[in-house]
């Protein structure tokens, strides 16, 4: 099999070197193309069909070579709709894989899978481009030091810390605050780490992509007045796109993130929403390419495809890519091959709870369901680990007592249990936090809380030093000193009412 070298030089070969073929067969988004003998393109080469349809409209379809069939024929998958294509149309081999613009020019802009801007803000400076198929970093380039990626969000940093260069699964239904959490992380990485973010919308609703863009403009994550000062690049391949585009849009976003890591030496946050749609698109393409399906109808190459994407997300000695991936679980079946393959790559899971959101506790991260492989004494230190374990134990005990409280009331509990409940309720409220990107909705200024401050705050609650403060004082504050100040303010307000 002729495969394209993954470190192929950027750009497209000269006109003289380009070979042309003709379309033989079209089955949905899959094209069979015949080339002259000895002029076959490599696997993953980009092919371009430029012609006019019967209504004399310009057709411009880019495809990617997937199989060499023999007899000088190749099978390619289209990255856009194949409407208007006919047998016999001319196909040009570009001589290189799909390449997309990278660098600062991508910030604040929306791209499609081909790296073309789709936001009507004019062309993008494409002097720097990278091919979307690239090798994962070599072993000697990897940074093996286990370090925490501080987000400034208390519940995440304390109970399910993110690994620098790790992969995090974000689980949550509609309306529990996934988008706001994503935007806050984008904002915090820019402020605290001087980093940038890339958002890959893979096979999700176009409306949601538009809403996210509008909210980012409103909150200042995308700076309309000075677009270069934006903190994020957006790449969309939504659910109305052909499977080829949905299968490759994740790689386009990852390629843009790799440039910031390798060339600009920055810490990058890569969001993929939704990683399941990447697998789903691969499954559709696999069937169209005539491969025998594997378990539950998925592609036989599921693990390989997932691995080739996930292994490129890593920390190197130059910088890091930390990835947060929304994971859809079909029919809530965690043993389904798609989520099961994803879980193998994750370092942490952040689970958003509808119950907490309904109580008004934001971020609505479930402190007991969210997990992280980083929460070990040798990585985070004994103080952090023991504080996190005691917080979880207190919340777990409160959860167990809730049924008794509902039936018999608080008065029937022992003195020790009543104290546990009081502290758990304070902890629950202290896990909430005002976000910078939510200032426009809440009116309260956002807070970035350093990890040391977070640990100190929870230690004070657990030690009983703050048992005298009302639980409302802990709601939507930053560090623990703000809770003490808020308690004094509340007390003064109550006195003035009397």
UniProtKB/Swiss-Prot annotation:
Entries under SMART domains matching the protein: AAA (SM00382)
GO biological process: proton motive force-driven mitochondrial ATP synthesis
Protein's membrane topology: Peripheral membrane protein
Classification via CDD domains: ATP-synt_F1_beta_C, ATP-synt_F1_beta_N, F1-ATPase_beta_CD
Subcellular location: Plastid, Chloroplast thylakoid membrane
Its biological purpose: Produces ATP from ADP in the presence of a proton gradient across the membrane. The catalytic sites are hosted primarily by the beta subunits.
Official protein name in the record: ATP synthase subunit beta, chloroplastic
UniProt source species: Aegilops crassa
